Curated annotation (Swiss-Prot):
It holds the Pfam family ABC_tran. The gene is hmuV. This is Hemin import ATP-binding protein HmuV. It comes from Deinococcus geothermalis (strain DSM 11300 / CIP 105573 / AG-3a). Its EC number is 7.6.2.-. PROSITE patterns: ABC_TRANSPORTER_2, HMUV. Its main location: membrane.
Length: 277
């Protein structure tokens, strides 16, 4: 079986940070949801965010989008609050946990929503990019399907194509701008093959200079695909480092309240986590 080639670094790569979070705090009605969150993401890095349900993972991502506030977050070297929404949307895209649609849009029209930040009017190039994005997620030929007739997993892949179209690199540009992709549980509705296809695609984007932050629940997917793992517990960062450094029995049991065994994967260069109870 083919071995996965993955960077193994204990610290972030040395390039300029795409995302910097410093002492981020967030409370609602006196309840502390995030406390002193600090980390950074650099170009070409895939950072997996792990934690129990309610640990603060999605709240953290909603801060990175600016939905819950813009303090404590810098992107591309500037405070988040200094960006116009349209300017930021051309360089940072987010795929939330759920994107419910109640209207019978054609699939291609949904993907074309990702091109809105790039111009007021739809162009033939936009449609070409949208079709290419659908092909990247395995949905070529779905362009004129009613999205409400698709399975949950297929709909999730349509929205993944939408954010791909949003960040699509211009092949004519002499230099590609730095970009960030935020994924909140991107594999939650997917079968095994498409879970791996989605994260392989994320890794491919990393080779193109995109920084990816992905909230995941599957520890083994994080072990296989992430450069670094950030564990959130009770709204705090309790561990941050390579999968080998972070995904240990002691750290996992403390974060998730479940005993595990960790062994070298028999086929891949990464840890393998199995339940021990």
């Amino acid at each position: 079986m083919r071995r996965l080639v993955r960077k193994t670094v204990s610290l972030p790569p040395s390039g300029a940070p795409l995302v910097e979070v410093a002492d981020l705090n967030y409370s609602v009605s006196g309840r502390e949801l995030l406390r002193n969150i600090t980390f950074r993401l650099t170009d070409g890095e895939l950072l997996a965010v792990l934690g129990r349900n309610g640990a603060g993972k999605s709240t953290l991502l909603r801060h990175l989008t600016g939905e819950l506030g813009k303090e404590g977050v810098r992107m591309f070297g500037q405070p988040l609050r200094e960006y116009a929404a349209a300017d930021l949307a051309r360089r940072r895209a987010a795929l939330p946990q759920q994107t419910p649609l109640t209207f019978a849009y054609e699939v291609l029209d949904v993907v074309l929503l990702g091109r809105i930040p790039h111009g007021r009017r739809e162009t033939p190039e936009d449609r070409e990019i949208a079709r290419a994005a659908l092909a990247r997620v395995g949905l070529a030929g779905f362009e004129h399907r009613n999205i409400l007739t698709l399975s949950g997993g297929e709909q999730q892949r349509v929205h993944l194509a939408r954010v791909l179209a949003q960040l699509w690199a211009d092949p004519a540009a002499p230099e590609q701008p730095a970009r960030v992709l935020l994924l909140d549980e991107p594999t939650s509705s997917l079968d095994l093959a498409h879970q791996h296809a989605t994260l392989r695609l994320a890794r491919e984007l990393c080779t193109q200079g995109v920084g990816v932050i992905a909230v995941l629940h599957d520890l083994n997917l994080a072990a296989q695909y992430a450069d670094r793992v950030l564990i959130v517990a009770g709204g705090r960062v309790t561990a941050l480092g390579t999968p080998e450094a972070v995904l240990t029995p002691a750290i996992i049991e403390e974060a998730f309240g479940h005993r595990v065994a960790v062994t070298p994967h028999p086929c891949l260069n990464c840890p393998l986590i199995v339940s021990a109870q």
